[in-house]
Regions:
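Conserved catalytic core of the tyrosine transesterase superfamily
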Residues: 1-251
Length: 251
């Protein structure tokens, strides 16, 4: 593989490994699942021996089961948003749900990205290196203004601290901790992660009447197929399912 890419083995990244496996698949007519499994096992062992971070590889010949995203109800969202004691954490949760942001997008959010006059949020170079704008609701704007007046951040909206106590962008673990703590204290039984809040944002917008193409742009998806999964979990009027037993004895 290193010879194929003409580089040092320890410099290989996930994308190169996946590309190489797809290359092997295209060369061989019927590669077995076990062939790719053992290829990946070998890669993982090599990573362990070399002391480098284990590569995350998608096996091209093995179809993963397609799971529908977890979606919270509106009542669960209301409960989650009012649970944190700190305003900073409530605002962070509000952005994850109210703007459909990814974890990294919340971390990298800067003061210059907030446009309160136009009620827009500028997401710079998110996943896929593509900027986008998402609407900022009045409730979020009020919360952000109150938080900014109290905390006075300089660059990033949400600061963390390095070992010397200097302000840096909040770590991924810091964002995830806020979500985890809110879930535990709220008593919600469903899985709640930053991405579950993003799924919930998308699903609720569809249920409120937003069209699928606009949702695609708000989420920053390149392929519409990625967005279409939310149609399967949305309770749209024309798609609301019911049990025939409920109507068997009704006139």
């Amino acid at each position: 593989m290193a010879l194929f890419f003409k580089c040092n083995p320890i410099d290989l990244d996930n994308e190169q490994v996946t590309d190489y496996l797809h290359h092997l698949k295209s060369r061989h007519s019927t590669p077995s699942d076990s062939f790719f499994k053992h290829t990946v096992y070998g890669l993982r062992y090599a990573c362990k021996v070399c002391g480098i971070k284990e590569l995350e590889v998608v096996l091209p010949s093995i179809e993963r089961p397609k799971k529908l995203p977890v979606v919270l109800s509106r009542e669960e969202i209301q409960l989650l948003l009012k649970t944190p004691k700190l305003l900073k954490h409530r605002v962070m949760l509000g952005l994850l749900y109210g703007c459909g942001l990814r974890c990294g997008e919340v971390r990298n959010l800067q003061l210059k990205d907030l446009d309160f006059d136009r009620k827009m949020l500028h997401i710079r170079q998110g996943k896929g290196r593509k900027d986008r704008y998402v609407p900022l609701g009045d409730m979020l704007i009020r919360g952000l203004k109150k938080y900014l007046d109290a905390e006075r951040p300089i660059t990033w909206c949400f600061n963390g601290n390095d070992k010397e106590g200097k302000a840096v962008a909040l770590s991924p673990r810091g964002v995830q901790w806020v979500v985890k703590q809110a879930r535990q204290r709220s008593g919600i039984k469903k899985e709640v992660t930053t991405h579950v809040l993003r799924h919930t944002y998308a699903t609720h917008l569809l249920e409120m009447g937003l069209d699928i193409m606009t949702l695609k742009d708000l989420l920053g998806h390149v392929d519409i197929q990625t967005t279409l999964v939310y149609l399967h979990v949305s309770r749209l009027d024309k798609q609301q399912a019911f049990s025939p037993l409920d109507r068997l004895y009704t006139k």
